[in-house]
């Protein structure tokens, strides 16, 4: 089964590029940019990755992002992730980045976007992997700050496909950003939002009301049977991240995870890695972890992979081509 999981064509839709910063690269970039880390070794960093909730993780995540200073840093970070995609047979990926995490440190937005973008283009040429870029607004900050960031992002419509919402979910509901997402839509961006990870199913409903194309996480939809039915009917995708959910105690263990239950209820759920450097695995490791717990059938794996294609922002022809490849895969 591992070989089957390794080689099946995969699409990843929930990946924070800052969350793919491996400890080794964190040290390399800290050295390159003359930054002192509070950790003495890679092992010490890994020990710190014992989180009890989302906030614990975010505190370390934002600290790690400090080593990202130059366009070259963003290029190297992104290209390292794209190499991983090549190894794990990810054929298309839609990557999140957090503009405000970097502009708050006086890093020019242009450097962030161009560094990431150039690495994505290089991966397209070298590995044939297609990709889109999604800019996430930080929900623990104000809508006003988010709107200023959105204005800047409008200069890069040729490079940014969608606007997202991430960071601390509790007490930062989607409606806090109602005006921002309305403006993003008017500007022609697609919309995605993290909702229903630590926040309740109510947050998912708010996100749907704001017209999102996709929900990131969404596992707490199960608290509301009507919502589950609505999601099955509308086929609004949920980009689910199993290892992340265990690491951040959204579920206590993999047996409790509801992704297969939601799949059986005909929701458009797919498998993703979220912040792989912090949560102990990329997309393949997430599939393997699910298989170890639930003994996935090949049909279930194919369905999860096809859902990811259908949930993507690829055009209809590209989707059909990929779905055919997955269906034909043995």
Swiss-Prot record:
It catalyses: adenine + H2O + H(+) = hypoxanthine + NH4(+). One of its GO terms (biological process) is hypoxanthine salvage. The keyword Transmembrane does not apply. Binds 1 zinc ion per subunit. InterPro entries: A_deaminase_dom, ADE, Ado/ade_deaminase, Metal_Hydrolase. Pfam families: A_deaminase. Substrate binds at residue 275. It comes from the Bacteria. GO terms for molecular function: adenine deaminase activity; zinc ion binding. The record marks 217 as: Important for catalytic activity. Its cofactor is Zn(2+). The active site is at 197 (proton donor). Its EC number is 3.5.4.2. Keywords: Hydrolase, Metal-binding, Nucleotide metabolism, Zinc. One of its GO terms (cellular component) is cytosol. Zn(2+) binds at residues 14, 16, 194, 274. It is an enzyme of class 3 (hydrolase). Belongs to the metallo-dependent hydrolases superfamily. Adenosine and AMP deaminases family. Adenine deaminase type 2 subfamily. Catalyzes the hydrolytic deamination of adenine to hypoxanthine. Plays an important role in the purine salvage pathway and in nitrogen catabolism. This is Adenine deaminase. It comes from Campylobacter lari (strain RM2100 / D67 / ATCC BAA-1060).
């Amino acid at each position: 089964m591992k070989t089957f999981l390794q080689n099946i064509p995969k699409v990843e839709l929930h990946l924070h590029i800052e969350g793919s910063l491996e400890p080794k690269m964190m040290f390399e970039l800290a050295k390159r940019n003359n930054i002192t880390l509070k950790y003495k070794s890679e092992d010490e960093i890994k020990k710190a990755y014992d989180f009890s909730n989302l906030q614990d993780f975010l505190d370390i995540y934002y600290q790690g992002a400090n080593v990202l200073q130059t366009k070259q840093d963003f290029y190297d970070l992104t290209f390292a992730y794209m190499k991983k995609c090549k190894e794990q047979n990810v054929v298309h990926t839609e990557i999140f980045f957090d503009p405000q995490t970097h502009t708050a440190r006086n890093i020019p937005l242009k450097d962030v976007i161009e560094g990431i973008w150039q690495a994505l283009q290089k991966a397209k040429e070298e590995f044939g992997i297609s990709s889109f870029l999604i800019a996430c607004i930080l929900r623990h900050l104000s809508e006003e700050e988010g709107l200023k960031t959105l204005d800047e992002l409008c200069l890069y419509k040729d490079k940014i496909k969608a606007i997202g919402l991430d960071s601390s979910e509790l007490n930062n509901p989607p409606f806090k950003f109602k005006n921002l997402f309305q403006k993003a839509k008017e500007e022609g961006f697609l919309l995605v939002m993290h909702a229903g990870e630590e926040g309740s199913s109510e947050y998912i409903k708010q996100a749907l009301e704001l017209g999102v194309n996709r929900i990131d996480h969404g596992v707490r939809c199960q608290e509301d049977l009507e919502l589950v039915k609505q999601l099955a009917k509308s086929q609004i995708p949920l980009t689910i991240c199993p290892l992340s959910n265990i690491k951040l105690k959204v579920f206590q263990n993999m047996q409790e995870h509801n992704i297969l239950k939601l799949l059986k209820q005909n929701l458009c759920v797919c498998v993703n890695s979220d912040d792989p450097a912090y949560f102990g695995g990329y997309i393949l490791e997430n599939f393997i972890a699910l298989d170890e717990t639930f003994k996935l059938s090949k049909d279930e794996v194919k369905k999860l992979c096809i859902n990811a294609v259908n949930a993507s922002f690829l055009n209809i022809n590209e989707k059909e081509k990929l779905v055919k490849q997955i269906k034909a895969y043995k």
